[in-house]
Amino acid sequence: MLEKSWAKTFADKVFPAIDENIFSVLYSEKASRPNTPVNVIVGALILKEALNVTDDEIVEAMAFDIRYQYALHTTSFEEQPISDRTLSRFRARVLSYETEHDVDLIHECVVKMAKEISDFMDITPDKQRMDSLMVAANIRNLSLLELFYTCVANLCKIMAERGAKIPDEQHHYIEKDDYNKCIYHKRDMDATERTIVVMKDADVLIKVCDSTGDFDDTSEYQLLIRLLKERTIIDGDGSRRLRQKDEVENPSEVLLNPSDPEATFRYKAGGKHLGYVGNVVESVGEKSSLVIDYDYQQNTYADNQFMKDYLKEKKDFCDGSFIVADGAYSGEENSRLASEHNLKLVTTNFTGRKPDEIYADFIFTENGQYLLKCKNGCIPEECKYDPHNDCSIAYFKTCECENCPYKKRCNPRFLKKRVRKEVSWKSVGRAKQLQYMKTEEFSEYAKFRNGVEAIPSLLRRRYHVDKIPVHGKKRTRLFFGFKIAALNFQKLLDYTNSLASYASNKKTA
């Protein structure tokens, strides 16, 4: 039975691909008490996401379910090496190391595993596609009143825990049911007036804390300071007031909920999103596909920056390699970076203003700064480069432009003695992209890209990426990494099952 279960594939292909040496930095080099094998811990965390179980259920399953023991190579152990705190302590170690050294060990491990698994699945990195997905933070979108109240109440509670004296007028923040009284039951003032009252209470508490300096090390104090800085302003007379909506600086990056201070806000596809954004790179073979790399940032991170980061980290690709993504990943710099790595970048949507297609036949110098020839074959008398607008300013003879068949589409500026035309290399590249989008080859690339849309859908439906039970970018990124590994395991399982089915059918025939 084990030979036909998921445990066989995991034990033979996934478990051996887990590189324990990556995590050696977490442990002492001195001989000491033996620790739980790291590959067992990492394997258990992958199975946790793949089978949608909790930490406690994994521990129980390893004690009583032979499939888990077989998958993690622990059948010969007299006692299973995982306890109720093993997984949480390992995650804490990894996060502590990342905070101190800015190195994501889980990402390194998952990417290396994907490389080994892709070799078995005969998937090469010459056909890639990229997509991003919004990952919801496990927080509520608080109103401004709720946000101020929560931050003030949190500071009051930590002051009470440390035995500090809370002013009488602010003492009610630590009383039971005060939140409901202030937010829902106090109807004699509107929400803005109540927010101003809480803001003034915050000012009083900050002054009390500043006088002693005993709370500078607390997140509650720091978050309240941040909130006052982002949402209030001090006028010339020294009084503090709430900022108007247009006065808020970087509204996408302000504090949304003290439970997750790193979560950001973004409008995308007509919806409001609080949290983070994941980016996945999928490599496609003849029979299957695999996520070979991923990234995870605050959701204000641009898609074209994800592409730029990915290309900068990669070495040269083999001839004929390409990567396909939607229009948000486009950009002249990204195309240049891809070309430097022998990779063709194809973006399937066109974003921004569309230039006239006649610009596709304009010829520039190699550095893209000077126009050499226009669509009609005319050579400018004089040409300058405008670094401020990153464009070329060319001057042509009046007689050439007056008789040009493309005059209306080009729309140059006629001066007294000559004609001025401003055009950038970016416009030429975008015009060439428009022409290319009408070809049959581009149509095939667009169909190829559509397949990557399944990844965000799977991560949401099967792996519950929007319900990660922790807060903060580093913590949620750790869970995201294991979900990617679980997704790859499922793809591997489907691949091995297809091979077994093919072999069975061949034998029957």
Question: Model-flagged regions — what are they?
Answer:
Residues 38-39:
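Double-stranded DNA-binding cores of transcription factors and transposases
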Residues 42-52:
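Alpha-helical support elements that line or immediately flank enzyme active sites
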Residues 54-57, 62, 76, 80, ...:
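Anion-binding and metal-coordination hotspots
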Residues 1-30:
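Basic, low-complexity segments
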Residues 31-35:
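Short basic-aromatic helix/loop recognition motifs at nucleic-acid
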Residues 65-83:
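Short, basic interhelical loop/turn and adjoining N-cap
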